[in-house]
């Protein structure tokens, strides 16, 4: 028997972007005790405040900046996974950004597809949040990303 969940939408927030209901049937993933079934891919704070996703993945095609991560984390009512580079930005800078993101309250950090496996390993040595490795090609050696320390894969 399907559960009937009481709901309140209000008048002013009745235009929320709703994730498809079928997502509620998924098992999801549990991170730090919180089950996450839906993840919205956005850096738009208006979208982030008005979507019913369980989490946000915030990556963008510019050099990652702590101020941007902090803004998104502070505006969000749900866990945020923030980008820490891996393309033009990499190496020690990505490691420092990952540590700073953890201190800001990020639930995890996302590394871009071209990141060196050694940088994933370095990030894992300094943070206690998941490292999410972006996979953008069927030619990516997924096993090496996982062996380097990636906890979750973002296939895009």
Where are the regions a protein language model picked out?
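Alpha/beta enzyme core
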Residues: 1-156
């Amino acid at each position: 028997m399907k559960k009937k969940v009481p709901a309140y939408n209000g008048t002013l927030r009745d235009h929320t972007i709703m994730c498809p209901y079928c997502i509620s049937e998924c098992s999801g993933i549990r991170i730090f005790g919180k089950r996450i079934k839906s993840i919205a891919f956005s850096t738009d704070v208006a979208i982030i405040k008005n979507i019913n996703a369980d989490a946000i993945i915030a990556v963008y095609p510019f050099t990652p900046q702590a101020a941007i991560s902090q803004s998104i984390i502070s505006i969000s009512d749900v866990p945020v996974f923030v980008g820490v580079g891996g393309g033009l930005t990499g190496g020690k800078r990505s490691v420092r950004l990952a540590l700073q993101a953890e201190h800001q309250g990020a639930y995890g950090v996302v590394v871009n597809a071209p990141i060196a496996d050694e940088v994933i390993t370095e990030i894992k040595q300094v943070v206690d949040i998941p490292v999410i490795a972006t996979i953008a090609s069927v030619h990516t050696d997924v096993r090496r990303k996982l062996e380097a320390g990636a906890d979750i894969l973002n296939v895009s």
